[in-house]
């Protein structure tokens, strides 16, 4: 299939009207992402120096009209010279088409290229899927609307593996293998596996490949629920939980520095599995969130140096990053750029490509970097690993998902990948500067002073290359995370997080007035701006190379407008009309500051900020009573009962309980419901009843409406009499 156009200069357009059925555009009518060649004449050589053309490696074709013109200075940048005076137009366009076709073949990665060609063959289908290239949909008005909405190619590319031309996605052969091998090269992995049902499944592939009952898993308490499901519930491993930081604003921080001390870890192992405490490598697998949802980034080299000798493998769940190796100042946090030897742990990395990279939703990838331990007993070879992969992979894959992973790797290949992310970081820096300059209530989570001057006065280009502008200085008040070590963490520059007022920066205590982030998030949604998530007094926006200055300026303008509405104390119905009219019995007559005050006072009266911090502090961890796998078995055996959370304290949880987002389990299966956990979830219950329209999503806890209209929270616990 011919995807690319040909860009022609004004002079050339007067001579060439069409090229082998391709669309022709003027050189000033394109951003060069959709053209396969630029054609100019020998009097327009200044275009050879166009940075956009050179950055994409687009062929430049020069038509010779005047043999006396000296073009020697430009020859190293010119792909082809056509002597128009001695050739027919047909021969000329044929030469141009050859160049374009070669370029087109070079930019399409292996699987996507094969898929495009296969779709172009227009085969007569008698295999799955039953819609047969969309034709079934076309036989009904509803189906036709569905087909027209998505367009022809998405249906024609939805293929069956009955035809093996595209390779096998389960045993990794043919073009499917080529695509994954190419991605491994781009990401510096030994082997890469494309996963089509999300990083929740990718994580389970990794965990089920490595862990068995009785194995020790060093468990970052920030881990996504899928780590519990795959590592604890399905594999039956024994968890050693590491406490993590939360700041008073609600941001998710990293593992405390002292948790990486060898003697401390061995002490924790001794509590659960005394016979393994003194083993050379007591830990089968450590699972670390390389980057938290809110953008606390680990130094991977530091992690491996501190605990690597205790672990067979370290698994970095990189769902919320994956682009770090394309941003030079972040390279120390990339596990895949580490130099490793036989004494180091094997490295496994999962990445949610769909989150901030260029993949369709549900696309994920697993990177395996463990050739340095090949031959050792702890090594997991491809065949054993792929056995786990096939347990979780569908035998009916959606080929466009796989193709998007292939294309993502191609986009990140070479210098262009770094260029895209550098531009993204610079856009994000400028947006933070704009908030600092234009907003009076909101502030970005960045150090106030760097290199002796205010953060906003730094040079954007230099800041994008200097991690000091994003470093978490231990115990600094501006971030209020406690327990960090020197150089341990920094802020992901691509997580644009803002802090709303209401928490005193110096003390971490609630102030008299505040603006909970949930109110700002709903205001933005009312105005068609969709943030990623919010927590108590934080709101998060994800930055990708898709962002532009125009888009960020529009966001900042809406933030400024929100602050103006707060100052004017306008009626709530003007700020949040959907919530106001959806719950008018509650909010009739409210002004926006009244809503802010009521919600702020609600959180303050229950000290939710402190409860949230305690949930992830070892001192307040729920008691570990039962292995999570056994707790789940009891749940399956119907040995649980559903009780109000007001009566759950001290009872053994049979399900993980968590708010979503962020998907981090607060009470693990097999733990006793603690007072802290009960108080936290009961505060959420109260909020659902007292502040309708701002209901959070909670999993593992069931909200049931009572006869009096009160919505009460329940959880499954082990039956007392059992």
Q: How would you label these PLM feature ranges?
A:
Residues 3-5, 190-192, 214-217:
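Short active-site oxyanion
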Residues 8-10, 22-30, 41-57, 64-66, ...:
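Conserved PLP-enzyme active-site core in the AAT-like
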Residues 152-201:
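Conserved N-terminal alpha-helix of the aminotransferase class I/II PLP-enzyme fold
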Residues 192-193, 350, 528-532:
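A short linear hydrophobic-aromatic micro-motif
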Residues 198-201, 247-249, 538-540, 575-576:
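Short amphipathic alpha-helical segments embedded in low-complexity Lys/Glu-rich regions
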Residues 200, 293-294, 548:
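Short strand->helix junction
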């Amino acid at each position: 299939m011919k995807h690319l156009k040909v860009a022609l200069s004004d002079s050339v357009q007067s001579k060439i009207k069409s090229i082998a059925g391709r669309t022709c555009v003027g050189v000033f009518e394109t951003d060069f992402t959709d053209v396969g060649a630029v054609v100019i004449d020998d009097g327009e050589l200044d275009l050879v120096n166009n940075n956009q053309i050179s950055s994409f490696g687009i062929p430049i074709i020069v038509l010779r009209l005047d043999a006396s013109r000296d073009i020697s200075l430009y020859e190293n940048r010119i792909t082809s010279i056509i002597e128009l005076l001695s050739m027919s137009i047909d021969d000329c366009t044929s030469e141009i088409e050859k160049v374009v076709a070669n370029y087109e073949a070079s930019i399409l990665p292996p699987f996507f290229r094969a898929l495009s060609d296969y779709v172009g063959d227009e085969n007569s289908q008698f295999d799955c899927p039953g819609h047969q290239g969309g034709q079934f949909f076309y036989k009904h008005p509803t189906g036709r609307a569905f087909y027209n909405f998505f367009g022809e190619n998405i249906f024609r590319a939805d293929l069956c593996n009955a035809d093996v031309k595209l390779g096998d996605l389960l045993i990794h052969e043919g073009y499917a293998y080529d695509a994954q091998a190419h991605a491994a090269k781009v990401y510096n992995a030994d082997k890469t596996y494309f996963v089509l049902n999300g990083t929740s499944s990718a994580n389970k592939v990794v965990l089920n490949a490595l862990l068995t009952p009785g194995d020790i898993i060093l468990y970052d308490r920030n881990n996504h629920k899928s780590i519990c499901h795959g590592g604890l519930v399905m594999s039956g491993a024994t968890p050693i939980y590491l406490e993590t930081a939360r700041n008073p604003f609600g941001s998710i921080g990293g593992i405390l520095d002292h948790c990486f001390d060898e003697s401390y870890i061995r002490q924790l192992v001794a509590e659960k599995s005394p016979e393994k405490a003194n083993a050379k490598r007591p830990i089968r697998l450590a699972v670390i969130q390389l980057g938290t949802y809110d953008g606390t980034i680990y130094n991977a080299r530091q992690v491996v140096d501190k605990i690597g000798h205790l672990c067979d493998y370290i698994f970095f769940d990189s769902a919320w990053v994956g682009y770090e190796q394309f941003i030079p100042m972040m390279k120390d946090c990339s596990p895949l750029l580490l130099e490793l030897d036989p004494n180091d742990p094997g490295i496994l990395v999962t990445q949610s490509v769909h989150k901030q990279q260029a993949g369709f939703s549900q696309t994920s990838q697993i990177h395996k970097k463990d050739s340095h331990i090949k031959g050792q007993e702890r090594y997991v070879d491809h065949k054993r690993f792929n056995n786990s992969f096939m347990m979780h992979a569908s035998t009916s894959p959606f080929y466009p998902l796989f193709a998007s992973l292939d294309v993502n790797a191609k986009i990140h290949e070479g210098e262009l990948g770094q260029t895209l992310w550098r531009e993204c970081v610079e856009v994000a820096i400028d947006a933070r500067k704009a908030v600092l300059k234009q907003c009076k209530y909101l502030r970005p989570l960045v150090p106030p002073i760097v290199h002796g001057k205010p953060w906003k006065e730094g040079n954007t280009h230099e800041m994008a290359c200097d991690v000091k502008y994003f470093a978490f200085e231990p115990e600094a008040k501006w971030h209020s995370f406690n327990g960090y070590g020197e150089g341990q963490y920094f802020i992901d520059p691509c997580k644009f997080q803002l802090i709303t007022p209401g928490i005193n920066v110096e003390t971490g205590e609630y102030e008299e007035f505040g603006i909970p982030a949930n109110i700002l998030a709903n205001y933005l949604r009312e105005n068609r701006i969709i943030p990623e998530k919010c927590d108590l007094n934080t709101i998060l926006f994800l930055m990708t190379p898709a962002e532009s200055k125009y888009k960020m300026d529009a966001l900042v303008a809406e933030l400024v407008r929100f602050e103006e509405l707060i100052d004017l104390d306008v009626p709530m119905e003007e700020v949040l009309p959907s919530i106001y009219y959806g719950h008018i019995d509650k909010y009739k007559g409210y002004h926006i500051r009244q809503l802010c005050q009521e919600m702020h006072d609600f959180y303050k009266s229950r000290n939710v900020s402190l409860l949230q911090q305690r949930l992830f502090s070892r001192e307040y961890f729920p008691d570990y009573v039962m292995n999570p796998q056994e707790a789940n078995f009891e749940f399956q055996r119907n040995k649980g009962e559903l009780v109000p959370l007001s009566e759950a304290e001290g009872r053994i949880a049979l399900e993980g309980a968590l708010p979503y987002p962020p998907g981090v389990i607060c009470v693990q299966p097999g733990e006793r419901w603690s007072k802290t956990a009960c108080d936290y979830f009961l505060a959420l219950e109260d909020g659902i009843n007292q502040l309708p329209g701002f209901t959070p999503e909670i999993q593992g806890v069931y909200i049931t409406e009572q006869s009096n209209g009160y919505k009460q929270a329940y959880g499954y616990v082990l039956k007392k009499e059992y």
